[in-house]
A protein has these predicted regions:
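Phosphate-group recognition and catalysis centered on beta-loop-alpha active-site segments
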Residues: 1-344
Length: 344
């Protein structure tokens, strides 16, 4: 097997379902993950945060004010708090202040109802899933569909959670080991915007690691001066010492200005031996690169498939999308076109 080849997956470009099929169902719910699997996703992505009793659950943030009905539960009114996490002060209800049993009494809701009103029709239909439940879903679906469906967990705010006595790295590794997924060829990637926890994880597991990068700012653990510095050829060589690939904001590859040309990031990452999985491809105008927007409102769906095809043409190895079926369609047409060109 060639170095770096993904034995578990049949395609050269991976479709990573961002929080599940979050363009069509409330994010980080079994509804969303199942929808993504049905639409052809290769991987489903749970962002992981801990409960008070140390159970890993899937929420984009530990503040669950916008993604659950917690505000309607009078028994939890006193849990409302203001906290500073990674330099950002926020008010709401936080997973680390609830036991798993308490969280399971809540119901998920759509985070962006103004942009995705159709998703709000599913409010109240799903609870907060645990990481173990998501692993079990991926295994059941793999057996039922006759194809491997992987998981792509993100460790959220690892330094913050360690600082309050709820470190997540060992819990994540233990769950993967229990699932039999502790090999470099397991259908798993672990991702983080921080650096030091990925370095720790490298010593704890053989699972492939992905260094996430934002278009601005720096890792919250202050392990690097900026994401921009990490994205230079020298920075990428340093990342390659502990990571299998990078997950950059797609604006780091195609700047978010009309008429932009792609940067050298993909070529530089590949030269360092890193795979490239950019985020996040969403259909709504507000999220698309400027050249792929269409007339209408911020919620109007633009030319997402054209955008994905362009990035596949640039050489990405996978991509995160809220709309896996559109990603699957774009990938199929891009690969068919490439195969046709190869006949010439």
């Amino acid at each position: 097997m060639a170095a770096g080849q993904d034995r578990a997956m049949p395609h050269p470009v991976l479709i990573i379902a961002h929080r599940g099929a979050s363009g069509e169902r409330p994010e980080h719910t079994m509804l969303s993950y199942q929808r993504a699997i049905d639409q052809g996703a290769d991987y489903i992505e749970p962002d992981l945060v801990p409960t008070k009793d140390g159970v890993l659950v899937a929420r984009h943030e530990n503040n669950i004010a916008d993604t659950t009905d917690v505000a309607t539960h009078p028994e939890f009114a006193a849990r409302k708090a203001t906290k500073t996490i990674d330099g950002e002060t926020m008010t709401g209800w936080f997973t680390e202040d609830f036991t798993l049993a308490e969280l399971k009494t809540l119901r998920a809701k759509e985070r962006l109802p103004q942009l995705r009103p159709g998703n709000a029709a599913f409010d109240g239909q799903a609870d907060i899933p645990t990481f173990d439940e998501i692993i079990a879903l991926a295994k059941r679906a793999s057996a039922a569909n006759g194809r491997m469906i992987g998981i792509y967990p993100e460790t959220k705010h690892p330094s913050y959670f360690a600082s309050i006595g709820l470190p997540t790295d060992a819990r994540l590794v233990a769950a993967l080991k229990a699932a039999g997924w502790d090999r470099a060829d397991a259908p798993v990637f672990i991702q983080s915007f921080e650096v030091d926890n990925l370095k720790r994880l490298k010593a704890m597991t053989s699972v492939r690691l992905i260094q996430l990068m934002a278009a601005t700012g720096a890792p919250a653990d202050h392990a690097a001066s900026s994401y921009a510095a990490m994205a230079t050829p020298a920075g990428l060589r340093a990342v390659a010492a502990y990571a299998y690939g990078i997950g950059p904001d797609k604006a780091m590859i195609l700047p978010a200005i009309p008429g932009a040309k792609p940067t050298a990031l993909i070529a530089d990452a590949h030269a360092a031996g890193l795979k490239v999985h950019p985020w996040t491809f969403r259909a709504e105008n507000i999220f698309l690169s400027p050249d792929y927007r269409v007339p209408g409102t911020p919620a109007t769906h633009g030319r997402i498939e054209d955008e994905i095809r362009a990035f596949i043409g640039y050489g990405v190895d996978g991509f995160f999308t809220d709309y896996p079926y559109k990603g699957a369609s774009a990938r199929a047409s891009a690969l068919a076109a490439a195969a046709e060109r190869g006949k010439d």
